[in-house]
Amino acid sequence: RAGLLLNERLWAESTDTVKGRAEHTRVHTQRVEKRGNLVNLYEFTVFSDSLLLLGKCDCVEARRDDSGCRIPAVDFPVSLYPVEYKHGTLREEETYQIQLCAQAMCMEEMFHTVISEGALFFTSSHRRMTIPLSETLRTRTVTLAKELHLLRDTLSVPSAKYSAKCCRCSLQELCMPKIKMSAESYLLRLRQEAAGIIEEASE
């Protein structure tokens, strides 16, 4: 999917993408909401020189913390807590957790702070899932960031590996993940069929 989006510039709409965009409309308005010792920053831009990433957090909850860091738009020290909004109901998705971790790692680098956890908010069920930002998750995030840059640098599109997530992917018809055979294996099969090695069922 990343290869098709980044290198082939392909996109297709689906019911899920339309619903997801509609649900993000309120969140995806850059603004700051202050409520006492809590400040919510929406569409908050983050970056990392070490990860070579630039993006936006759906929401960052900045809570007053005398031992915390200083950030723009807030006049007191805070601890940071990223919240990523997702369409659908509460579920485990590694890619969502990696996205959240990348956002946290960007802010740690930007503001010289430590962020131990964040949350995924699922809009259909209105439930939060707390995500501990473990060393394992951080290592996986760094690895995928490097793979993403390599993908972009080589302008390659990896072969698709079919999984349950493909069923609801908007790019399924462009990606065709169920077609696993290469051109060579396809031609070999045709030659074998012509030679009578493979007998097709007549029923």
Language-model segments: what does each one mean?
Residues Y81-Y85, L120-F121:
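Glycine- and acidic-rich phosphate- and metal-coordinating loops
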Residues R1-P82, A195, E203:
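Metal-dependent nuclease catalytic cores that hydrolyze phosphodiester bonds in DNA/RNA
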Residues E94-Y96, P132-L133:
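Short, solvent-exposed loop/turn segments at secondary-structure boundaries
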Residues Y85-E93:
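Short beta-strand-loop-alpha-helix junction that forms the active-site gateway
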Residues C59, Q103, C169:
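A residue-level signal for conserved active-site and pocket-lining positions in enzyme catalytic cores
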Residues E108-E203:
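Metal-dependent nuclease catalytic regions and adjoining charged, substrate-binding loops involved
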Residues Y96-E108:
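Short, charged, amphipathic alpha-helix that recurs within catalytic cores of restriction-modification
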